[in-house]
Amino acid sequence: MTAPGDLLQALFLRLKSDKSLSALLGGAGLLEHAADNAAFPHVTCGQTSAFDWDTGVQNDADQLVTLHVWSKTHGEAETRAIMDSIKARLADAVLIIGPRGQTRLVLEFAEARYDEDLLVHHGLLRFRAITQDSD
């Protein structure tokens, strides 16, 4: 099993090592939580949940992680370019997180839209992270 914090740390390390994504984000655009004055574009981590769909109880071996992409000036094209870069880096990736085993990422959902209330383009990427323990 992989703790949600360990998983997020591994995801962010993998994304931060991607030079093309860093260029799209202007360097410091990967944020755990965005401050009100955060520069655009940026990516934040949204809800993370660990759940066993068969038994209905919490289970760190099967987690959902949501990443949010935020863009203002360059809009939808920028949002989609950042989303594509993240998908290329994470979809079907296998992460080794500590001694517990391998965590495989599968893209479950992606959406880009304009948020009229916030006046920003907003992209959502939801990944399922499935950990298989080493024996």
Per-range role (PLM):
Residues A50-W53, K72, A112-Y114:
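Short beta-turn/strand-loop junction motif enriched in small, turn-promoting residues
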Residues N59-T73, H121-Q132:
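Oligomerization/assembly interface segments of phage tail-like spikes and tubes
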